[in-house]
Amino acid sequence: MDTHDNIITFNHVRFKYNSDEPLALNDVSFGIPKGKWTSIVGHNGSGKSTIAKLMVGIEKPSDGHIYFRNQCINQQNLSDLRQHIGIVFQNPENQFVGSTVAFDVAFGLENNSVSYDDMQRIVPKALEDVEMLDRADYEPQSLSGGQKQRVAIAGVLALNTDVIILDEATSMLDPAGRKELISLIHRLKEEKEVTIISITHDLTEAAEADYLVVLNDGEVYQTGKPHDVFNDGDGLTEIGLDLPFSIRMARTLLGSTDFITYEGLVKKI
């Protein structure tokens, strides 16, 4: 399978959690373009979080192969893989171990035997990248939801990973926090050239991505750019996904079924 343009590739992957259970993923094949933002979307139980676990090696395929930088992932190279892929979960509090924001970001570096002098340089830069340097001495528990997510992302950036997986990272945020995090994702992708993978059921968030992978009941339903995927609006609705607000409003106000961003909708009305 040609994986040249993808940093991660799933090739006919099947997975089940227990031998007597049905497949959680069935013959799943797709690629994650390097340096882009890919959003993996689907309703609850579609297999999104299972894919995230497979990407970071928490689980391994029952059948098929997963490639990272054209190299098939196996037990021999799994530890190396984990140095290149970081994950931020829905509730970052479950990841916090430090008494302060700075100490929490430094924790992963310490586990990787990074010297104290290097940590003194890396931690402030990572916090600056997510606009949290002024909160370095705060207790993580005192932060807002959006700020906690930024600190969790800083911890991943400090490790100089190539891929950041955001597993439902915006689902517990208010609209302002969600908007700020999405803006940060765009900036990190452009300035740091990292590959972003967001796991979500929110198509309004997914519309911000460069590329989409749509799952339905453990299988790939559709892949492509948002413009192409959302033009199949009726199909997405049939598999239990709510179309982005801008598209729903365009249908109601303009009678249009074409993909349109929120900014584009405002201009038309």
UniProtKB/Swiss-Prot annotation:
PROSITE patterns: ABC_TRANSPORTER_1, ABC_TRANSPORTER_2, CBIO. It comes from Staphylococcus saprophyticus subsp. saprophyticus (strain ATCC 15305 / DSM 20229 / NCIMB 8711 / NCTC 7292 / S-41). It is found in: Cell membrane. InterPro entries: AAA+_ATPase, ABC_transporter-like_ATP-bd, ABC_transporter-like_CS, ABC_transpr_CbiO/EcfA_su, ECF_ABC_transporter_ATP-bd, EcfA_1, P-loop_NTPase. Keywords: ATP-binding, Cell membrane, Membrane, Nucleotide-binding, Translocase, Transport. One of its GO terms (molecular function) is ATP hydrolysis activity. The gene is ecfA1. SMART domains: AAA. Transmembrane segments: none annotated. It is an enzyme of class 7 (translocase). It is a peripheral membrane protein. Forms a stable energy-coupling factor (ECF) transporter complex composed of 2 membrane-embedded substrate-binding proteins (S component), 2 ATP-binding proteins (A component) and 2 transmembrane proteins (T component). One of its GO terms (cellular component) is ATP-binding cassette (ABC) transporter complex. It holds the Pfam family ABC_tran. SUPFAM superfamilies: P-loop containing nucleoside triphosphate hydrolases. ATP binds at G42, H43, N44, G45, S46, G47, K48, S49. ATP-binding (A) component of a common energy-coupling factor (ECF) ABC-transporter complex. Unlike classic ABC transporters this ECF transporter provides the energy necessary to transport a number of different substrates. Residues 8-242 form the ABC transporter domain. Its EC number is 7.-.-.-. This is Energy-coupling factor transporter ATP-binding protein EcfA1. The lineage of its organism: Bacteria, Bacillati, Bacillota, Bacilli, Bacillales. Belongs to the ABC transporter superfamily. Energy-coupling factor EcfA family.
